[in-house]
Amino acid sequence: MTQSKNKVVIFLGPPGAGKGTQAARLAQEHQLVQLSTGDILRDHVARGTALGQQAGPLMEAGQLVPDELLIALIRDRLADMEPVRVIFDGFPRTQAQAEALDLLLEELGAPVSAVPLLEVPDQVLIDRIVDRGRQAVAEGRAPRADDNEETARKRQQVYREQTQPLIDYYARRGHLYTVDGLGTPDEVYERILSGMH
């Protein structure tokens, strides 16, 4: 990957597949900015920006932030980035969001470069999530509230229902490639790199 040109990577995969771990490493080693819409939202709310003032009450009420507002927040974040070198982690979640993001990226002259889909068998994912909770307790940290088997299974089901149209969308555009998410983090990382063009 050259560092002087635009690069937009969107990680897809179920909860527990290792997207965050792999995205962080790719960002660090290839001078990409890892963007989390949640972090962007919280930053705007904390700074009291106009966009943050719109998003804050929705977030406090536990409501979804409308796609138009999310895209406006992303547009604001990418506006000063030259070249645009980002990894999206946790966004888009729907085909409508993907289509809106594509329009924005085309405006910026920075189309999607790659969409690695981390695939891991469901039972392995559930075991990873439950183990993550156990490890937190063993280290004296509070486990994430959703690091239990019942919640993990529900999250897998929701992921499958919500994400399949997104997988199909990026596959039709030729951006998607499947990565075997089993093995060591280094092995998975090498598979991610080998799939990028």
UniProtKB/Swiss-Prot annotation:
Database matches in Pfam families: ADK
GO terms for biological process, alphabetical: AMP salvage
Binding site for ATP: G16, A17, G18, K19, G20, T21, R132, G183
Region (LID): 131-147
Span list, region Disordered: 137-158
Listed pathway(s): Purine metabolism; AMP biosynthesis via salvage pathway; AMP from ADP: step 1/1
Domain characteristics, as noted in the entry: Consists of three domains, a large central CORE domain and two small peripheral domains, NMPbind and LID, which undergo movements during catalysis. The LID domain closes over the site of phosphoryl transfer upon ATP binding. Assembling and dissambling the active center during each catalytic cycle provides an effective means to prevent ATP hydrolysis.
Name of the protein in its database record: Adenylate kinase
Organism: Deinococcus radiodurans (strain ATCC 13939 / DSM 20539 / JCM 16871 / CCUG 27074 / LMG 4051 / NBRC 15346 / NCIMB 9279 / VKM B-1422 / R1)
Gene it is expressed from: adk
